C-alpha cells in the first residue's frame, strides 16, 4: 500500500538523547582512564569544516509515498550517526504503509557503508493526522574520520591543537555503544603527544570519545 501525502515524525529521538547524547561534551567518562599506546598514533586529524546548514537534500516531493518519507528520515538519522557529510542513500519496502503496528527492515548507506534499521510504525501524531510516529533502531553503528574530528574539536574547542588517531577510515561499521578498535589522543596547544589515548565509540546520535 502506497500512502500519499503522509509525513512522518520521529519519536525515537527521545530515546536517542537518553541513551546516546551527553550534550556534546563527552570528555566526562565512565571511569575509563587514558591508555598509554607507547607510540605516537599515525593519523593526524585537523579541524574539519562545519556541517552545512539547512535540510538534507534531496528531500521528498510533496506527493511522495510514505516509504519515501520514511527513507528520508532515515537518511537524516544516518548523517547524525556519522557526524559527517557524504553520499547517503536509504531504501524501505516500497509497499510499506503507515498502519500502526507495521514493522519492516530498511537499509541506509553512508559512503557505501551499509546499516540496517529495525523500523516499527506507531499511531498518528497528536499534532496532526498527517504525521505518523515511528521508531527506528540501527543494527550497527558507523564511525567516520570527519565525524570523530568534528566531535573532538567541538568538545575541546580552542584548547586543542590537533588530534592523533589510529587510522580511522572515511567511514566504517562499528558496534553501537561499546569501545571500538579505534583510539585517539587530543594534543593541546603548546603540548606534545603523550602517547595516552582513549577509545572512540559509535552511538546512534554520533561518535563519542571516552
Predicted regions and their residues:
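Extracellularly exposed regions in secreted/surface proteins, prominently low-complexity, repeat-rich
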Residues: 33-35, 151-210
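Acidic (E/D-rich), amphipathic helical modules within compact regulatory domains
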Residues: 90-137
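Bacterial signal peptide processing site
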Residues: 22-25
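Serine/threonine-rich, repeat-prone extracellular segments and beta-strand-based repeat modules
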Residues: 86-105, 166-178
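C-terminal motif of bacterial Sec signal peptides marking the signal peptidase cleavage site
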Residues: 17-20
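N-terminal low-complexity, Pro/Thr/Ser-rich intrinsically disordered segments
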Residues: 32-73
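Short, non-transmembrane alpha-helical segments in secretory-pathway proteins
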Residues: 57-89, 141-168
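N-terminal export and membrane-targeting signals
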Residues: 1-11
Amino acid at each position: 500500500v502506497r500512502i500519499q501525502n503522509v509525513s512522518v515524525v520521529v519519536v525515537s529521538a527521545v530515546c536517542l538523547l537518553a541513551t546516546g547524547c551527553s550534550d556534546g561534551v563527552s570528555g566526562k567518562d565512565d571511569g575509563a582512564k587514558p591508555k598509554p599506546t607507547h607510540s605516537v598514533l599515525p593519523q593526524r586529524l585537523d579541524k574539519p569544516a562545519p556541517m552545512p546548514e539547512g535540510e538534507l537534500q534531496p528531500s521528498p516531493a510533496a506527493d511522495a509515498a510514505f516509504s519515501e518519507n520514511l527513507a528520508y528520515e532515515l537518511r537524516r538519522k544516518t548523517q547524525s550517526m556519522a557526524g559527517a557529510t557524504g553520499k547517503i542513500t536509504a531504501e524501505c519496502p516500497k509497499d510499506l504503509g503507515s498502519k500502526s503496528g507495521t514493522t519492516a527492515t530498511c537499509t541506509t548507506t553512508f559512503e557505501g557503508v551499509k546499516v540496517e534499521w529495525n523500523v516499527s510504525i506507531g499511531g498518528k501524531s497528536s499534532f496532526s493526522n498527517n504525521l505518523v510516529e515511528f521508531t527506528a533502531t540501527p543494527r550497527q553503528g558507523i564511525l567516520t574520520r570527519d565525524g570523530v574530528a568534528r566531535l573532538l574539536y567541538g568538545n575541546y574547542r580552542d584548547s586543542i591543537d590537533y588530534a592523533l588517531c589510529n587510522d580511522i577510515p572515511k567511514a566504517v561499521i562499528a558496534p553501537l555503544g561499546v569501545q571500538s578498535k579505534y583510539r585517539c589522543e587530543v594534543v593541546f596547544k603548546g603540548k606534545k603527544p603523550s602517547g595516552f589515548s582513549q577509545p572512540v565509540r559509535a552511538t546512534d546520535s554520533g561518535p563519542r570519545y571516552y
